Design a protein with these regions (language model features):
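A short glycine-rich, Lys/Arg-flanked "PGG" loop and its adjoining helix->strand segment in the class I
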Residues: 122-137
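Short, glycine-/aromatic-enriched active-site segment of Class I SAM-dependent methyltransferases
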Residues: 140-158
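Class I SAM-dependent methyltransferase SAM/SAH-binding core
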Residues: 42, 48-97
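A short acidic, Gly/Pro-enriched loop at the edge of an enzyme's catalytic core
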Residues: 96-108
């Protein structure tokens, strides 16, 4: 597992990572997708573009790398260094008002960002679905918690801590025909990678705690519209 993402330069990860390793997350997510060369993919909430680099290099797709933060100029320089300036197009835009016409994209990818902008009821169906072609594929990595941590009587209103089954119900209510929804096998590894890159002095005891924290689950969901 994660053979493809292992080959990337750690200096690139250190420069662009802003959370659990997006290369690992995108690698495992796309194993459950059917991306083909030449497809036009919307990478929404892409941060500094690690997921976009992976999509373009590993699948030969063209990517609109969209994030609301002011990373576009940095991302342009990074893409040039990676030889991807003609395959990945960085765009600074709000997810609620994307400047693309209806039916533009063959697929939507969103890695560890959806909870930042998409949790208003109807958001996916009204704001994102129209941008996708009929039958387009959707793949997301979402923050959540392990199913085994749910106790009887839990009233979990915070979407950041939803389980896979709760996320599945949410997206089905938003019009997505869900095909897979499960916790990522690389969850612990992706979090530890981030911790060691940003805190080189982190102790083994601190790293051990990652595997026991139910609030650090990462959920992958794929489906079609």
């Amino acid at each position: 597992m994660l053979e493809r993402s292992q080959k990337y330069d750690r200096r690139l990860m250190r420069k662009c990572m802003a959370g659990p390793n997006a290369l690992y997350l995108t690698d495992e997510l796309t194993e459950s997708m059917h991306l083909e060369p030449g497809m036009l993919v919307l990478d929404l909430g892409c941060g500094r573009g690690l997921s976009s680099v992976f999509l373009a290099k590993e699948y030969g797709v063209r990517v609109y790398a969209v994030d609301k933060n002011e990373y576009a100029s940095e991302t342009c320089n990074m893409l040039k260094d990676q030889g991807l300036e003609n395959e990945v197009y960085p765009i600074q835009a709000d997810a609620a008002s994307l400047p693309m016409p209806r039916g533009t994209f063959d697929a939507l990818v969103c890695v560890n960002a959806y909870h930042n902008f998409g949790m208003e009821a109807g958001f996916f169906e009204e704001k994102l679905r129209p941008l996708l072609r009929e039958g387009a594929e959707v793949g997301m990595v979402l923050l959540g918690r392990d199913e085994g941590c749910v106790k009887e009587g839990d009233d979990n209103e915070n979407p950041v801590f939803w389980t896979a089954s709760e996320w599945k119900r949410w997206f089905e209510s938003e019009g997505l025909a869900v095909e897979t929804c499960e916790q990522l096998k690389c969850t612990e590894r992706a979090w530890k990678e981030w911790m060691t890159i940003y805190s080189p002095s982190v102790t083994e005891e601190e790293l051990e705690k990652v595997k026991f924290n139910p609030e650090l689950a990462l959920i992958k969901i794929t489906g079609r519209v």
